[in-house]
Amino acid sequence: MSGDYILNEDGTLRKPHVTPSVPTMNELAFQFNETGAEQAARHFIDLINYSWASGDTTALDEFSEERCTYCQVISQRIHDVYDNGGWAYGLKYTVSQVEGNYPVKTDTPETAQFTDCYVMSFLMHRSKADRYEPPTLEHVPAGTGRLIPIVHWDGSEWKMAEAGGEDIETAQSE
């Protein structure tokens, strides 16, 4: 054994047994307003947590619009770890505080593409976790950061249009 982890026959570390379930969206998310937007953004965070725990990004990718580069980066980072025999254990993001939640003003060329969108600011907490990328086991410390999600209402449901933040992006690779 290596620490609390069991070695496989090939010398790699076996991932601890976890059986996460694909998160379902809160009923309050099925409305085009501030509450629905916040619940959709929280669902996105739940999907990130599920994807890191399972290695399965299907639900995350389906919830993300093609234009969401942040979503693509997270999905690819998870694939980079899991597709090469690695895993993450204990990694969880939680919203500590909602600092803002507003409809996007689309009166500038930079924001015109965000019709029917809400932008939020979340103060986030990241749990301490272990990430294994053969042959390295890394103990990722707990941390905080800010996530700025933009969710889009397509007329019947929310999708993640874009996101960004400070420290939260680098949390994926610390």
Q: Which residue stretches match the model-derived regions?
A:
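Core segments of small alpha/beta cavity-forming domains
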Residues: T12-Y89
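Amphipathic, hydrophobic N-terminal targeting peptides for secretion and organelle import
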Residues: M1-V22, G165-I168
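Exposed beta-sheet edge and beta->alpha loop/turn motif
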Residues: Y102-E174
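Compositionally biased, low-complexity repeat tracts
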Residues: L7, S96, H139-P141
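Short, mixed-charge, low-aromatic patches
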Residues: M1-D4, K15-H17, Q31-E34, Y102-T108
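A mature extracytoplasmic/lumenal domain signature
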Residues: S64-R67, S75, Y93, F122-R126, ...
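A short, amphipathic edge element
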Residues: N84-D107
